[in-house]
């Protein structure tokens, strides 16, 4: 479903990604862990070309990701993304935030888009907030709207870039629960997160990044109980000590 081959990314002289080779089959849930500045978010953002790459290729569902144009827009429509910030339109109701993409990009009729939106808002547990505006919702609720909005496009892949890091601690679990239920339903997911419990519980596979490279790639049990590199051991020692 996702194939990255020899991907290199620079910000001026700084190499953010080094020779990334990664294949994610359909239905797999991949959690990307690593210290700050290790390239996790950059990796996630290159998958739908929010960040350009200097070398290498990226394929989504067998199609080469172009640099720009209509073909890129088509592929992007199949890749849902949820960010640290919710990026909801403040002047639109919750329901209208969710229906906008399907109507504009998928050319869905308003009645059908409304039906899809209400089903998804139900699924993420906030159908009763459909007519409210983003400012009237908590951070956790807004992030769940952002997930519903991404799902409304019926994506083949969902990317999550630290979706809980801007939330108050008591709101984190409500978002992780939605993500875990998506994982159980077989959605192909790449999640950048610091939530170790989620990684252990919901991931099929853990990637550990350091200095722009993937240095470990294993199942969660192996990674958390028997990490292979000193860098990963050090990282887990610091994180799990708290």
UniProtKB/Swiss-Prot annotation:
SMART domains: AAA
Domain ABC transporter intervals: 2-236
This enzyme's EC code(s): 7.4.2.1
Record-linked Gene3D superfamilies: P-loop containing nucleotide triphosphate hydrolases
Catalytic activity: a polar amino acid(out) + ATP + H2O = a polar amino acid(in) + ADP + phosphate + H(+); L-glutamate(out) + ATP + H2O = L-glutamate(in) + ADP + phosphate + H(+)
Residue numbers binding ATP: 34-41
Keywords: Amino-acid transport, ATP-binding, Cell membrane, Membrane, Nucleotide-binding, Translocase, Transport
Record's bilayer topology term: Peripheral membrane protein
Enzyme class: translocase
Gene Ontology MF terms in the entry: ABC-type amino acid transporter activity; ATP binding; ATP hydrolysis activity
Cysteine disulfide partners in this protein: none
PANTHER family: AMINO ACID IMPORT ATP-BINDING PROTEIN, GLUTAMATE_ASPARTATE IMPORT ATP-BINDING PROTEIN GLTL
Family to which this protein belongs: Belongs to the ABC transporter superfamily.
The protein's assembly and partners: The complex is composed of two ATP-binding proteins (GluA), two transmembrane proteins (GluC and GluD) and a solute-binding protein (GluB).
Name of the protein: Glutamate transport ATP-binding protein GluA
């Amino acid at each position: 479903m996702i194939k990255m081959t020899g991907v290199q990314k620079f910000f001026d002289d700084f190499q953010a990604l080094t020779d990334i080779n990664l294949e994610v089959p359909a239905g797999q849930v991949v959690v990307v862990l690593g210290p700050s500045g290790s390239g996790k978010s950059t990796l996630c953002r290159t998958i739908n070309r929010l960040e350009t790459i200097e070398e290498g290729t990226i394929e989504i569902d067998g199609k080469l990701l172009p640099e720009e144009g209509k073909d890129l827009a088509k592929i992007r429509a199949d890749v849902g993304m949820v960010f640290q910030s919710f990026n909801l339109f403040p002047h639109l109701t919750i329901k209208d935030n969710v229906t906008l993409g399907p109507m504009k990009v998928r050319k869905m009729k308003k009645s059908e888009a409304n039906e899809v939106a209400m089903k998804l808002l139900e699924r993420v547990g906030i159908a009763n907030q459909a007519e409210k505006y983003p400012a009237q919702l908590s951070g956790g609720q807004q992030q769940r709207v952002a997930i519903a909005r991404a799902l409304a496009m019926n994506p083949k892949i969902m990317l999550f870039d630290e979706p809980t890091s801007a939330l108050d601690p008591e709101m984190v679990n409500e978002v992780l629960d939605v993500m875990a239920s998506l994982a159980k339903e077989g959605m192909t997911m790449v999640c950048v997160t610091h939530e170790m419990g989620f990684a252990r519980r919901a991931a099929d596979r853990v990637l550990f990044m350091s200095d722009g490279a993937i240095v470990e790639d294993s199942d969660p049990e192996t990674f958390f109980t028997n990490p292979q590199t000193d860098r990963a051991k050090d990282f887990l020692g610091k994180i799990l000590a708290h």
